[in-house]
């Protein structure tokens, strides 16, 4: 009998010892989940069917050269008008953004050129988005002559900083572009690789601008809040899965 009592007591002790840590672990996990801030939700900037949320830079509806097909927003550049497209033009988001993480997939036609411009100040003072907003270059590196110019290749912070690594895919394939701007800290990411990192609105930033083609544009790279623009550079370009997250 004494041996049975001993075994019962020992068994209960072991059961208690085994269950207690599990309870603590579960509690710790619950606290961790509760105390972790929830990330801001992604906001879709393109529903795959309409131009809702976009307009032509300077006002008005999106031009007819911009089209939607198979969930893609693309520029039909068949009708040339100088360096841009007839009834095309740059398009911008209706909404402005300050601290954000922007994503889109892009695909360029052979010999094509385009860009994603951000922190754009849309006003009558400026004729084009690139007069105020920095640009992540979209380019056919193998076919377009701009690729011969350092800091003009796909993924570069156009005319300011060259990518530290070339990760662009061959023409006709989809590339994932990301722009992360947070309190002046800027990261450009192409196909999962951080290709440009810099800090805006510092003396070093001003020096970059002073040594670029934007040096005589007083509003360039100055605005801390603005629109996202997709550029019409007169070439066919496709975009899809366009979204943004406020930081």
Predicted segments, located by residue:
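Sec-dependent signal peptide recognition
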Residues: 2-9
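Bacterial N-terminal signal peptides
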Residues: 9-15
């Amino acid at each position: 009998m004494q041996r049975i009592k001993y075994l019962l007591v020992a068994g209960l002790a072991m059961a208690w010892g085994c269950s207690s840590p599990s309870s603590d672990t579960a509690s710790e996990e619950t606290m961790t989940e509760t105390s972790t801030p929830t990330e801001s939700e992604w906001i879709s900037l393109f529903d795959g069917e309409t131009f809702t949320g976009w307009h032509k830079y300077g006002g008005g509806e999106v031009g007819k050269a911009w089209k939607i097909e198979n969930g893609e927003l693309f520029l039909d550049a068949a009708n040339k008008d100088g360096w841009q497209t007839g009834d095309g033009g740059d398009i911008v988001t209706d909404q402005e953004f300050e601290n954000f993480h922007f994503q889109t997939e892009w695909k360029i036609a052979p010999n094509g050129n385009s860009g994603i411009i951000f922190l754009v100040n849309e006003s009558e003072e400026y004729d084009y988005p690139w007069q105020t907003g920095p640009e992540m270059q979209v380019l056919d590196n193998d076919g377009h002559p701009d690729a011969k110019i350092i800091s003009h290749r796909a993924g570069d912070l156009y005319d300011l900083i060259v990518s530290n690594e070339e990760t662009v895919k061959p023409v006709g394939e989809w590339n994932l572009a990301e722009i992360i701007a947070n309190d002046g800290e800027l990261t450009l990411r192409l196909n999962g690789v951080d290709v440009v990192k810099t800090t805006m609105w510092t003396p070093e930033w001003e020096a970059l601008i002073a040594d670029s083609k934007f040096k005589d544009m007083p509003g360039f790279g100055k605005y801390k809040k603005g629109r996202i623009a997709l550029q019409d550079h007169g070439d066919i370009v496709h975009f899809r899965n366009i979204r943004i997250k406020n930081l």
